[in-house]
Every structure is written in structure tokens, then in C-alpha cells.
Amino acid sequence: MAVISMKQLLEAGVHFGHQTRRWNPKMAKYIFTERNGIHVIDLQQTVKYADQAYDFMRDAAANDAVVLFVGTKKQAADAVAEEAVRSGQYFINHRWLGGTLTNWGTIQKRIARLKEIKRMEEDGTFEVLPKKEVALLNKQRTRLEKFLGGIEDMPRIPDVMYVVDPHKEQIAVKEAKKLGIPVVAMVDTNTDPDDIDVIIPANDDAIRAVKLITAKLADAIIEGRQGEDAVAVEAEFAASETQADSIEEIVEVVEGDNA
């Protein structure tokens, strides 16, 4: 049974790629057709690769892997944070700070500073400090939480990194590759897939598409850690047991949506 049905992918708009003039030719094999100047992703391949990504993430989690979710654009930020937290993992959903992985020692010092400021507030230190100094500390904490809050409790460099839009997150992907960290990613038609270990061909610009894929990978982590029974199965999910919609039906939907 496919972990994501063709129907779910269609409803979330996962099939819409970028304008044809913005494509990366290396994504050609994942593209089904072109309609009205927009590339249409082959969802039969997305179904297959989503299954592979699910299995990869589940198996990694079963071996106690630390997973870092990365998605800093506005369409991804909320889903990345919510699903990372739901699956007990870590996230970066604002600007990626260069050296987050390759200069982990320095990042740990900044995280330690964040924790120190929090302790100062909790133990009453703020109450005896001048208001001006407290204001500066709060400003520093807010900034540190914005960029590092999602990895504040990450015990080590991640074993796996999941990325929404590796075209935008090129620095993060390069750091992961330098350290030998496998990358699972939603890859749109404008992206070079060469540095991605586990590819999910998908529209990475639609909020619903990002939420669907990201939530399913979070489910994989939960299953890997807690077993299949821990994953909540949606009522319509059983429909994915049936034969996937045909390519012709996909074209009809796409033509209708782009009319």
C-alpha cells in the first residue's frame, strides 16, 4: 500500500512544477508533461519515491537517528516546525546560519548562551539587573530562539537531514554532504537533484503539498520509534490501496486546474 495516494497528491497540488523556462534539465525524468508553460510532475513517480523516502526515514528512526528538518521559506516554516516537534525531532525554519553543521562547536556555544539567558530569567537574576540590561538580554534571547530554538536540544550533529526546497537551502545541503549526512528532500522541477540522496519529486511551493509530504515523513519517524500502531491513519488513507489514478486522469485534472 502506498503511503501517499495519487488522490492526496493531486488534491495538495503536488504535481505542479515551475515554469518551463525555469526548469533544471536534470529533473527531466521526473516530469510527465508541460501544460500552459508549467511543468507537470509525474505523480506515479512521486508515489514510488515517497514510499522509498518513508522507508528510509522509518528505518533511520528505528536506529535512533537524529533528524533535522530544514525549510526556511514561508510556505514551509510552519509545517517543518510542527512536524519536527510532533515526531520528536529538530528543525530550522528561519534563515540557515552558515556553519550550523560544519562549525557545530560554535553553534553549540550560541545555544549555551541561549540556555544561560533562560536560566537567568528563571532563577530571578533578571529581577536584580538594570532594566536596560534585561532588555538587551531579552533581545538577544529572541534572536537566538528565532535561529536556534529548533535545535536547542539537538544532542549531536544530525544523522539525517530532511529539506524542503534544496534549491533555496543549498548551503544546508552542501554542509550535510561535506559531513556525509544523507539528505531526504522535496525536489521541484527547478532544482539540481544530484546532491540529494533520497528524492521526492514534488511541488515545494504550495503549503498543502509541503504539509502533506512533511507530515508523512514525520509519521515514518514515529513508526520507526514507536511502531506502526503509533501512526494515526486517516480515514481516506485506505483508498490508497486501490490502483492509482491513471496518467490520463492526471492530465485531465491538470488541464482543468490550468484552464
Swiss-Prot record:
What PROSITE patterns does the record point to? Answer: RIBOSOMAL_S2_1
Q: Does the keyword Membrane apply?
A: no
Keyword Transport found: no
Pfam families (alphabetical): Ribosomal_S2
MF terms in GO: structural constituent of ribosome
> A cellular component term (GO) from this record?
cytosolic small ribosomal subunit
Q: Kindly state which keywords UniProt assigns to this record, in alphabetical order.
A: Ribonucleoprotein, Ribosomal protein
- GO terms for biological process, alphabetical: translation
Name it. Answer: Small ribosomal subunit protein uS2
**Originating species:** Streptococcus pneumoniae (strain CGSP14)
